Amino acid sequence: MIDDDGYRPNVGIVICNRQGEVLWARRYGQHSWQFPQGGINPGETPEQAMYRELFEEVGLNKKDVRILASTRNWLRYKLPKRLVRWDTKPVCIGQKQRWFLLQLMCNEAEINMQRSSTPEFDGWRWVSYWYPVRQVVSFKRDVYRRVMKEFAATVMPVQEVAPPRVPPAYRRKRG
């Protein structure tokens, strides 16, 4: 589903722990990392799409998280020309995203990136709040900066009580 301007509706998910760190996921078979994200299906609300993507990509359910915030507006990024599929109609030139900030409410051992038959990620780790802005692929950097800036005031008070943690090395897929 591509809008009239060539953007695919999408949701992005920032999951934070009580220390204010965020879940950073490694793309399957690659050396690139990002937040979970995915398309909105016809008839789905952004929130419904977020919960579906949360389960497919991270293996968590609604009961495992709490919504702390969502972006006020759609945020857009354009794909580099080399990534645009010019032979498909309508042509998708980028993504327009609604972002959700979630607090992890369950034990992090519940995270399982192998729930889907085609996993998006094969590892994850907790990183400092602003780390993703510097590390994400360049064409997504402005959106990440805007998302993290919008969510910052909400995340900082969450850092009070520490839940149980898995050792800090990035976690491999389960399955």
From Swiss-Prot:
<dbReference type="InterPro" id="IPR020476">
    <property type="entry name" value="Nudix_hydrolase"/>
</dbReference>
<feature type="short sequence motif" description="Nudix box">
    <location>
        <begin position="38"/>
        <end position="59"/>
    </location>
</feature>
<dbReference type="Pfam" id="PF00293">
    <property type="entry name" value="NUDIX"/>
</dbReference>
<dbReference type="InterPro" id="IPR000086">
    <property type="entry name" value="NUDIX_hydrolase_dom"/>
</dbReference>
<protein>
    <recommendedName>
        <fullName>RNA pyrophosphohydrolase</fullName>
        <ecNumber>3.6.1.-</ecNumber>
    </recommendedName>
</protein>
<keyword id="KW-0378">Hydrolase</keyword>
<comment type="similarity">
    <text>Belongs to the Nudix hydrolase family. RppH subfamily.</text>
</comment>
<dbReference type="GO" id="GO:0006402">
    <property type="term" value="P:mRNA catabolic process"/>
</dbReference>
<comment type="function">
    <text>Accelerates the degradation of transcripts by removing pyrophosphate from the 5'-end of triphosphorylated RNA, leading to a more labile monophosphorylated state that can stimulate subsequent ribonuclease cleavage.</text>
</comment>
<dbReference type="InterPro" id="IPR015797">
    <property type="entry name" value="NUDIX_hydrolase-like_dom_sf"/>
</dbReference>
<dbReference type="InterPro" id="IPR022927">
    <property type="entry name" value="RppH"/>
</dbReference>
<dbReference type="GO" id="GO:0005737">
    <property type="term" value="C:cytoplasm"/>
</dbReference>
<dbReference type="InterPro" id="IPR020084">
    <property type="entry name" value="NUDIX_hydrolase_CS"/>
</dbReference>
<dbReference type="GO" id="GO:0034353">
    <property type="term" value="F:mRNA 5'-diphosphatase activity"/>
</dbReference>
<feature type="domain" description="Nudix hydrolase">
    <location>
        <begin position="6"/>
        <end position="149"/>
    </location>
</feature>
